[in-house]
Amino acid sequence: MSNRQRFTDKVVIVTGSAQGIGRGVALQVAAEGGQVIMADRSEYVEEVLTEIQCTGGDAVTINADLETYAGAQAVVVKAIEHYGRVDVLINNVGGAIWMKPFEEFSEEEIIKEVNRSLFPTLWCCRAVLPTMIKQQSGVIVNVSSIATRGINRIPYSASKGGVNALTASLAFEHAKNGIRVNAVATGGTEAPPRKVPRNANPLSQNEKNWMQQVVDQTKDRTFMGRYGTIQEQVNAILFLASDEASYMTGSVIPVGGGDQG
């Protein structure tokens, strides 16, 4: 953890904060003096809250379904009621559910992928904008993915491509309101076993093979030949969220060890 205090007195919403990258972001924001609103639909977010409070940090949690606009609005309302403002929004919800060729996806599965990996970011941006416009200040960091190209996850890739487009367009539209919008395109990242599984279990041998192809592609086409760590992703996200990146907006920063897709 950094000894810096980049988020002192700043109110920071972190979505998807019960585990993985989101948990790492929430812990470090709190360690750097931030007031954290942790949004997740898993009860495991309460364990992260306990970790923060045990080290003297300031945080609250909200269980919310961010695949709905009502869920996103509830998170912003909680932040305003508890802290009075929102300085930073970090959109971290998402993740591929199935890994298989596009023609193997059903209509229902495609909709679920888009609901998981595009709409939470879209809804949270929409929900927080009125507050940031009123403040004439704010920072949004969207967690995207290197996987906007590659095999066996096209609905997820399309969703993250949408996140990248949203990032660029919001930055252009709201620079005049003092709002910066950037994204980190994460590559393959090593993480502890997930308490709440993100991917559907591969049932057939074909599904196992398709998933393995994605894993192999990630390592084989990465210059550095390895997965990143959660801390390496957290470092990039919080750089963009902090005043250190005050002259950056509309950027999508790849953090994937040179991943070429």
Task: Locate the predicted segments by residue.
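Short C-terminal tail/terminal secondary-structure segment
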Residues: 2-4, 96-99, 226, 237-238, ...
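Canonical Rossmann dinucleotide-binding motif of NAD(H)/NADP(H)-dependent dehydrogenases/reductases
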Residues: 5-37
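The beta1-alpha1 cofactor-binding region of Rossmann-like NAD(H)/NADP(H)-dependent oxidoreductases
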Residues: 63-75, 107, 231-232
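Catalytic Tyr-X3-Lys loop
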Residues: 103-122, 137, 141, 163, ...
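Alpha-helical segment proximal to the catalytic Tyr-Lys
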Residues: 130, 172-176, 246
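A glycine/serine/threonine-rich, flexible loop-to-helix segment
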Residues: 176, 188-221
